[in-house]
Amino acid sequence: MMKYLNKDIWFKAPLIKPKITLNNNYFLVGKNRQTKWSITPNARIISHNYYVHDLSELREFESFFNDKKARVKSFFIPSHTKDIISLKAASGVTSFKVISSNKPFWIYNQTRHLIFNRKFASQVLDIKQIQDYEEIVLKDPLPFEIDKNTLIEELISVRFNRDEIEFIKSGAVGFKTNLDFKEVFYE
């Protein structure tokens, strides 16, 4: 299992794109809810559905869950989407240019870490807006060349959001489970 900042990275791919919700505070005005808008980071709740093919894979899920002591220890999960489309960058550089970064939402507000091709992870230090593109500055130099085909995912620091894990029998040998993760920022 790959580690980053002394935490495990869990690469198990969910069945479908995860459901992500934000925990915004709100107040009631009459019978209506009004969200308190804030530009500060909000802890996201990420819900993944998994299909477990056999008992050995089920035991892997259980041991990982028990190792993290449910809600106690944090770890990283990738976003399982190509979050950034990069322009070509050489190895050994600490910044790279991007044409697509989903800037209105996550890059300025949420993201702290990126993982490249599931081999190298680094912390995002700064994002600079330069005319038609953005430049992302990393803490560590890139160990390999990147281009538009490089898979660049957000790396999210999370904990399990429940104290138990439940598997439901599906078919002759498979099991289904749903895991909720809560984002943690400063651990």
Q: Residue ranges of each PLM-predicted region?
A:
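Extracellular/virion structural assembly segments
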Residues: M1-Y133, L138-E187
